[in-house]
């Protein structure tokens, strides 16, 4: 292969340097690797569909396992158990990403793995679950109102979030940039009469063998912050309307980009 001399790129730069090969010039190959992986083949699309189905089924099983007085950590265990029964895999320390602060706290936090609380009826639980099936990742979930449904202001926030997600997904076409999609989502909140449109988190990433699948830097060295969609990318859309445990609303949809 001619890899014993010349300029050789490694997606793990540290590994390349540890080889200590004096006859090669070690360069960073992470971005070229991500460039190749960002657009999915038909086979990869099917693998990602299967992984997504495992996540959806595991979420439904977990919800069905809930009972009054159940603790958050026990609920997490039900999700992990369901994933294994369905043939999937969850990395330690767990699949759930978002924290669910209680006591009226509107903070946006990640699950610390030490959080624990009684999952009371009427609480909004944010499902953002990570795992793999046949090495391909799943990512996604929505808001579950424990033993009920959204009411009052929370229902308005939920409806606005659903409408924003629908509008953004419709706009997720080849050539569209992330900043354009964020503007589409915020515009829906403003026209729906919901306050705090600028506080809503709207973000995206690639999905495949990892939860990145994107170049961090373009070929000219410019950070790839406002990246452009391409056909057959698989891109999760995330929208989080912040609030306390009765008002925060979350939706994540995994989207295949098509013309």
Each model region followed by its residue ranges:
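Active-site neighborhoods and metal-handling regions in enzymes and metal-associated proteins
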Residues: 1-259
């Amino acid at each position: 292969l001619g890899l014993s001399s010349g300029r050789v790129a490694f997606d793990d730069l540290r590994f390349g340097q540890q080889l200590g090969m004096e006859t090669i010039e070690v360069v960073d190959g992470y971005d070229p690797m991500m460039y190749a992986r960002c657009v999915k083949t038909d086979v990869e699309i099917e693998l990602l569909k299967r992984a997504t189905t495992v996540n959806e089924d595991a979420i439904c099983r977990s919800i069905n396992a809930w009972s009054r007085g159940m603790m958050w950590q026990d609920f997490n265990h039900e999700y992990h158990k369901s994933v294994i029964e369905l043939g999937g895999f969850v990395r330690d320390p767990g699949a759930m990403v978002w924290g669910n602060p209680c006591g009226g706290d509107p903070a946006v936090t990640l699950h610390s793995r030490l959080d624990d609380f009684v999952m009371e009826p009427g609480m909004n639980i944010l499902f953002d679950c990570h795992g793999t099936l046949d090495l391909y990742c799943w990512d996604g979930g929505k808001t579950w109102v424990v033993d009920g449904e959204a009411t009052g202001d929370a229902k308005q926030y939920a409806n606005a979030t659903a409408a924003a997600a629908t509008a953004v997904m419709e706009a997720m076409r080849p050539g569209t940039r992330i900043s354009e999609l964020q503007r589409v989502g915020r515009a829906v909140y403003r026209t729906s009469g919901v306050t705090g449109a600028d506080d809503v988190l709207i973000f995206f990433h690639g999905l495949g063998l990892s939860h990145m699948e994107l170049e961090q830097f373009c070929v000219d060295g410019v950070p790839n912050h406002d990246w452009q969609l391409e056909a057959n990318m698989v891109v999760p859309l995330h929208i989080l309307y912040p609030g306390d445990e009765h008002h925060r609303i979350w939706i994540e949809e995994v989207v295949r980009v098509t013309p």
